Every structure is written in structure tokens, then in C-alpha cells.
């Protein structure tokens, strides 16, 4: 918890901004001093907290930090204004609308030595945090594959990016995070089925530098809302459902056979299933606590760095480029 009461601001009061406002108003050690959005406060998220018309008005109040939850197209301009004013920022994902913009944001904050982070919220999901800890402890043995499914109905809140940058960035980031590896290459196909200008479906095949194969299915076309990550390894598989924050382990069975013809071709068999008991705190609250602590001087707070956010944008751009060209796109390792 913060040693002092930090004064926080918020830019963007839309579908995601309202949740940030709710958390900020209840966050220990933090006071939400104002929210800025030229479009008003359509969800009434601020309550009695003042609403301002723009980021410049918010900067004039000299907040200790600002949360950026405006549309992706404005992330760069808002972030650069905050960096110029020496104000730390928690920026919603994706970091920026393209790679050059993301690089400019990284440079602006790093060159000034400012605390800044990207809101890749899945890193704070208790199911994925538990999965990552267990993978690091070697409970699955060698990891072979990561497969994710993230689908649901079209969200009216999204207008300036497609499903790759809005949703698939979750899976692209979490895959590298839980495995501790980087994408070496990606191949992708996209579709436009809803009549909107951006893609609403993507399937991605990726290879990580560790040799792990990744598969991602993401769309805005399904009546079924699903958020599932499956990691398969030599001892079985973990399944994380980030909607319910449940983590389940399916162990490989060990069934002996004396039938040589079967034994020679036998693969894995189904073993025990374990559903872990995990404390289930809201990921957005944990994300805010983590950033608050970083602003307050905690060196190992566990924020998602801007460079990690830049990497997610780079992988997302490679996915879109592959879908356009029909070719597998390599990614430089960093």
C-alpha cells in the first residue's frame, strides 16, 4: 500500500474508463482528482469527481499519475503530453496504434526516467498467475504448446482497431509471459464478417524461440463468450479460464500394458484432474495496486513495462502483416 495519498487522474470515460474510475475511487492510498473526456461521462462513472474536457486541463492539476483509457488512436498524443509534463502513466493496451507510435511513447518516458506501464490485464488474472508460477516450478515439465480461445459477441465500444489489437494482444502477451519466451514467427488469417472496416476474426499460428508452438483463435462473432488458455507439456496440461479465474490440471496417466503392439504406439492417457483453489481478486484492482506501488517507489512492483507493451504491438503488427500477405512473418528477438 502507498505510504502517502497519491492524486490520480483518468483520461477516457468510455466502456473501459468507467471501470478504471470505479477502481480508482476505491483504491487505498489514492484519490481520483478528475477525469478527462471531451465526450462527457456517459456512464456516470465519476460521480462527484470533476470532469475536464481534455488532458491539458488534467495536467494543470499536477496529478501524481494518470491512467490513459481513451481510444487507441489517441494513446500516443495523450501519453506524450503526460511525459512532457513529467507525469507517470498507466496506459491501456495496446500501447499505441502502431509500432512507430509505440516507440515514441517508450522513448518519451524512458528518456525522462518516468514510471510508466501498459494495462495488459491478463497478467493479473489469478488463474494465469498461478499457471505461470507452476510452469516456472517445472510442474508441467517441458512445454509443447500454448492454445488460446478468446471469442464473444461484437462490442459496440470498439471503433478504431480490429480484433487483433483489441483482443488478440491479450493472448500474444500472455503466451510470452507464462512461458518466458518470445515469438520467433507468426502466420495468420483474418476475416471481415460483420461489415465493419476492421477484422473481426483471426487465427494465429506462432512459434516461440523456445520451440513452443502457439495457436490463437480470436473473434467478435460468437454468441459464446470464452476466455481459455491451454498449456500442454510432457506431464499433462493446464487449462486457465480467465472469465472464472479457474485453473485446472489434467495429468498424463500411467497405464501399463503387456500388449507389445499397443505399447509401441501408445501416447499419453488420461490421468487425474485437479482444480486448484485460488484466491480470486479482481485483476483490474491488482493492476492498479501494482502501478500505485510502482509510482510510490516500489522497485519490484511487477508492472508491465512499456517495452513489453511495445513487443505486443510488434507481434500484433506481424500478425496483421501475415494475414495481408499470406506469408509467415519472422520476428526479431529482443
Region spans (language model):
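Short, Asp-centered acidic motifs that coordinate Mg2+ and/or phosphate
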Residues: 34, 65, 145, 213
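Rossmann-like dinucleotide-binding domain that binds NAD(P)(H)
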Residues: 155-224, 228-230, 307
Amino acid at each position: 500500500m502507498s505510504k502517502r495519498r497519491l492524486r490520480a487522474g483518468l483520461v477516457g470515460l468510455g466502456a473501459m474508463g468507467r471501470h478504471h474510475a470505479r477502481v480508482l475511487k476505491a483504491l487505498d492510498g489514492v484519490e481520483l482528482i478528475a477525469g478527462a473526456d471531451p465526450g462527457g461521462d456517459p456512464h456516470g462513472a465519476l460521480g462527484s469527481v470533476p470532469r475536464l474536457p481534455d488532458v491539458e486541463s488534467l495536467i494543470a492539476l499536477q496529478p501524481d499519475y494518470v491512467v490513459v483509457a481513451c481510444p487507441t488512436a489517441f494513446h500516443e498524443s495523450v501519453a506524450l503530453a503526460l511525459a512532457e509534463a513529467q507525469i507517470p502513466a498507466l496506459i491501456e493496451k495496446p500501447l499505441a496504434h502502431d509500432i512507430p507510435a509505440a516507440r515514441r511513447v517508450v522513448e518519451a518516458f524512458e528518456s525522462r526516467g518516468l514510471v510508466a506501464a501498459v494495462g495488459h490485464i491478463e497478467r493479473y488474472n489469478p488463474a494465469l498467475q498461478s499457471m505461470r508460477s507452476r510452469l516456472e516450478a517445472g510442474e508441467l515439465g517441458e512445454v509443447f504448446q500454448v492454445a488460446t480461445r478468446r471469442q464473444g459477441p461484437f462490442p459496440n465500444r470498439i471503433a478504431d482497431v480490429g480484433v487483433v489489437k483489441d483482443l488478440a494482444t491479450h493472448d500474444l502477451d500472455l503466451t510470452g509471459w507464462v512461458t518466458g519466451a518470445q515469438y520467433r514467427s507468426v502466420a495468420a488469417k483474418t476475416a471481415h464478417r460483420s461489415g465493419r472496416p476492421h477484422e473481426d476474426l483471426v487465427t494465429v499460428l506462432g512459434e516461440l524461440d523456445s520451440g513452443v508452438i502457439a495457436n490463437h483463435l480470436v473473434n467478435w462473432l460468437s454468441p459464446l463468450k470464452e476466455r481459455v488458455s491451454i498449456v500442454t507439456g510432457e506431464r499433462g496440461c493446464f487449462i486457465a479460464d480467465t472469465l472464472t479465474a479457474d485453473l485446472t490440471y489434467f495429468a498424463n496417466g500411467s497405464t501399463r500394458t503387456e500388449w507389445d503392439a499397443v505399447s509401441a504406439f501408445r501416447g499419453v492417457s488420461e490421468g487425474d484432474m485437479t482444480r486448484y483453489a485460488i484466491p480470486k481478486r479482481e485483476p483490474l484492482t491488482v493492476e492498479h495496486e501494482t502501478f500505485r506501488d510502482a509510482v510510490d517507489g516500489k522497485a519490484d512492483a511487477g508492472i508491465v513495462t512499456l517495452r513489453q507493451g511495445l513487443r505486443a504491438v510488434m507481434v500484433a503488427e506481424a500478425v496483421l502483416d501475415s494475414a495481408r500477405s499470406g506469408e509467415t512473418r519472422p520476428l526479431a528477438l529482443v
